[in-house]
């Protein structure tokens, strides 16, 4: 008996009462090489369709592939950073299938002899605890082309009037990183999935092997999910959810799929082994095609390529190129700055850590740099619908703003106006201040005293309270002076003048 694909969902707590969530994560990473995996075609993102192709990546008769050595180096460095064993003898294999996104009707991948095996990645969960995710393998392969389905309601082939194919991406170097089964996480399974992809993205970014842009497809996550009845030993039927294009979506997709599968099982149905597509708009998954097995792909060794046999000396040479890894770097910076675990987690979760570090390196204090990036600039990024690092302002420019505040030329309120001018493309903060002298903090005590006297005269009751020793009442007068000077006064200096005027 099978059930409707989308029965009434169970609450996640109801799922956990009867089932153990089981995960497996597959992450495809496009390598940032200049040319494709097996040919000299460029890999520029966003080029006109079918302008970065040649006989090799189109699979024309007589064309022969040549391995991109830079891609192999990147794959080995990824394996080393994931604590994997690097194979002394690996081979490419043909993965045969008949989808139009690969014009050869096969994909050159690795099957039973991958470049890296048996590693792990320790990830930090929201409460600061560590979870070890074991890595089964990391293997090299070529990417597929892109299909654009025209018409229909979802942009997928169902209901489309026709499809367009762009083979620019076909042959771009990929590393696929596959975890071992992730079980025992219970209620935290979706969180573990998100934390793993987050940590992996940070690691790959630090290695400088990919730009890991999930929104552009250079890092793509597939989440395998199944449910195992409490006390059982046999794994349930798994589904593979694709089209998970953000860190938040990883957690949402896994949680939804667990709830959906439980509802199917509780309704007396069977979970179908299939690929499913994540729908960003409503956080659900929809059915795709039935999931193939390895036998369906009829793997066999690639006859046109020699085995990959990295020497121990080469592997150790590449190990020496590994940078300070993200978790080591974070621990060092946390100690240097003297901030809490919670503050560091917030910076990482906001994708602000690298920006704050660069701002500090440009001369700002850690506290000031952090405050700008996680508050006002984060608000601006959210308003514009972009990532924090995509804002048109650099860490050096933020450091300039901090320096202008420290020098007394700007206060915090006016500094935000300066930042707005920078975001509008009007130049560096110092240039903005030069072009807009009205933004500079008023330092003329004569003018400030006149504004203070006027505010006190307009508020005699408050003036009397201040004279009677109630200094806190000065806040109202300070606020009035700030309004009168359009925010250009130094609040601390204004308060001093208010107290002086009241005989304090």
UniProtKB/Swiss-Prot annotation:
Catalytic reactions on record: L-glutamyl-tRNA(Gln) + L-glutamine + ATP + H2O = L-glutaminyl-tRNA(Gln) + L-glutamate + ADP + phosphate + H(+); L-aspartyl-tRNA(Asn) + L-glutamine + ATP + H2O = L-asparaginyl-tRNA(Asn) + L-glutamate + ADP + phosphate + 2 H(+)
Family matches, as Pfam families: GatB_N (PF02934), GatB_Yqey (PF02637)
Keywords recorded for this protein, A-Z: ATP-binding, Ligase, Nucleotide-binding, Protein biosynthesis
A single BP term in Gene Ontology: glutaminyl-tRNAGln biosynthesis via transamidation
UniProt EC number: 6.3.5.-
SUPFAM superfamilies linked to this entry: GatB/YqeY motif, Glutamine synthetase/guanido kinase
Record flagged with keyword Nucleotide-binding: yes
GO terms assigned for molecular function: asparaginyl-tRNA synthase (glutamine-hydrolyzing) activity; ATP binding; glutaminyl-tRNA synthase (glutamine-hydrolyzing) activity
PANTHER family assigned: GLUTAMYL-TRNA GLN AMIDOTRANSFERASE SUBUNIT B MITOCHONDRIAL AND PROKARYOTIC PET112-RELATED, GLUTAMYL-TRNA(GLN) AMIDOTRANSFERASE SUBUNIT B, MITOCHONDRIAL
Recorded family membership: Belongs to the GatB/GatE family. GatB subfamily.
Subunit: Heterotrimer of A, B and C subunits.
Function summary: Allows the formation of correctly charged Asn-tRNA(Asn) or Gln-tRNA(Gln) through the transamidation of misacylated Asp-tRNA(Asn) or Glu-tRNA(Gln) in organisms which lack either or both of asparaginyl-tRNA or glutaminyl-tRNA synthetases. The reaction takes place in the presence of glutamine and ATP through an activated phospho-Asp-tRNA(Asn) or phospho-Glu-tRNA(Gln).
Cited NCBIfam families: gatB, PRK05477.1-2, PRK05477.1-3, PRK05477.1-4
UniProt protein name: Aspartyl/glutamyl-tRNA(Asn/Gln) amidotransferase subunit B
């Amino acid at each position: 008996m099978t059930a409707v694909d989308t029965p009434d969902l169970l609450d996640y707590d109801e799922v956990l009462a009867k089932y153990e969530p089981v995960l497996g994560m597959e992450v495809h990473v496009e390598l940032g090489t200049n040319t494709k995996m097996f040919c000299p075609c460029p890999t520029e993102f966003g080029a006109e369709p079918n302008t970065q192709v040649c006989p090799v990546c189109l699979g024309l008769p007589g064309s022969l592939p040549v391995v991109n050595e830079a891609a192999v180096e990147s794959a080995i460095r990824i394996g080393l950073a994931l604590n994997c064993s690097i194979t002394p003898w690996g081979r490419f294999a043909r993965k045969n299938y008949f989808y139009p996104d690969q014009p050869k009707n096969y994909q050159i991948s690795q099957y039973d002899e991958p470049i890296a095996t048996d590693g792990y990645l320790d990830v930090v969960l929201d409460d600061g605890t560590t979870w070890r995710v074991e890595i089964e393998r990391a293997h090299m392969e070529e990417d597929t082309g892109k299909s654009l389905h025209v018409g229909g309601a979802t942009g997928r082939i169902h209901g489309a009037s026709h499809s367009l194919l762009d083979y620019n991406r076909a042959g771009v170097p990929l590393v696929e990183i596959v975890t071992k089964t992730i079980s025992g996480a219970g209620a935290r399974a979706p969180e573990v999935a998100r934390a793993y992809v987050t940590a992996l993205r940070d690691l790959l970014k630090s290695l400088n092997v990919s730009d890991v842009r999930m929104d552009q497809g250079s890092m793509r996550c597939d989440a395998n999910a199944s449910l195992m009845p409490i006390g059982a030993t046999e794994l349930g039927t798994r589904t593979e959810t694709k089209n998970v294009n953000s860190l938040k979506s990883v957690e949402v997709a896994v949680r939804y799929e667990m709830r959906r599968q439980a509802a199917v099982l509780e309704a007396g149905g069977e979970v179908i082994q299939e690929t499913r597509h994540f729908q960003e708009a409503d956080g659900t998954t929809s059915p795709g095609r039935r999931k193939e097995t390895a036998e369906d792909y009829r793997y066999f060794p690639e006859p046109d390529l020699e085995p990959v046999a990295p020497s121990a000396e080469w592997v150790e040479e590449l190990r020496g190129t590994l940078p300070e890894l993200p978790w080591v770097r974070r621990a060092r910076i946390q100690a240097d700055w003297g901030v809490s675990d919670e503050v560091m987690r917030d910076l990482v979760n906001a994708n602000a850590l690298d920006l704050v570090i660069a701002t500090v390196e440009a001369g700002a204090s850690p506290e000031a740099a952090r405050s700008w990036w996680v508050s006002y600039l984060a608000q601006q990024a959210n308003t514009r619908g972009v990532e924090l690092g995509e804002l048109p302002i650099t860490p050096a420019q933020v450091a300039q703003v901090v320096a202008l505040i420290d020098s007394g030329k700007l206060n915090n309120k006016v500094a935000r106006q300066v930042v707005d001018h920078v975001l509008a493309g009007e130049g560096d903060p110092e240039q903005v201040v030069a072009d807009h002298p009205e933004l500079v903090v008023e330092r003329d005590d004569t003018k400030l005293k006149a504004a203070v006297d006027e505010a006190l005269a307009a508020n005699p009751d408050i003036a009397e309270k201040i004279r009677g020793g109630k200094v806190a009442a000065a806040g109202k007068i300070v606020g009035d002076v700030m309004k009168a000077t359009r925010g250009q006064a130094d609040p601390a200096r204004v308060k001093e003048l208010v107290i002086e005027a009241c005989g304090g």
